[in-house]
Amino acid sequence: MESWLFLLAILVVAWLGKNQSLQIATVVVLLIKLIPNTSKLLTTIGQKGINWGVTVITVAILIPIATGQIGFRDLWHAFKSPVGWIAVACGVLVSVLSFHGVGLLSATPEITVALVFGTIMGVVLLKGIAAGPIIAAGITYCIIQVLHLSLQ
């Protein structure tokens, strides 16, 4: 019963915060919970859902390469600027931080509750996005702003 109340509270917060992604995600989880004998499905989604989400985001990121909007020339150009090098460094940093984050969650699963709450607060109150690879771009943006670098 507690999980239903918690999910409904999240749905209300998502609705009040006008966060469509969180609303959809919460409704999907509630609908899955309504179906009998779905505990294995919920467990599988809980264990593999992040990887599936990262895969979907990665596909979306690769689309400009597939359509020809981005090519080797753009990659070469990126390496000729401080902004490009910062982006590469942030990508490496995020992957290392993610590695350590997974280790932390494995060692202390109770932190998951705080992370979920913090993510929901960031998504709803600060109009953030609950995503992984996009964090690298966000960190890159912050460093670029601090160093007053041009995006060109």
Curated annotation (Swiss-Prot):
Q: Which GO terms describe its cellular component?
A: plasma membrane
User: Where does the record place it?
Assistant: Cell membrane
- Does 4Fe-4S count among this protein's keywords? no
Where mainly found?
Answer: membrane
Keyword Cell membrane present in the record's keywords: the answer is yes
A Pfam family in this protein?
DUF441
Signal peptide positions are none
Q: TM spans, by residue?
A: 25-45, 52-72, 85-105, 115-135
Sorted alphabetically, the keyword list is: Cell membrane, Membrane, Transmembrane, Transmembrane helix
Protein's membrane topology: Multi-pass membrane protein
* Record family assignment: Belongs to the UPF0756 family.
Please name the HAMAP family in this protein's record.
UPF0756
Protein name as annotated? UPF0756 membrane protein lp_1894
Q: Which organism is it from?
A: Lactiplantibacillus plantarum (strain ATCC BAA-793 / NCIMB 8826 / WCFS1)
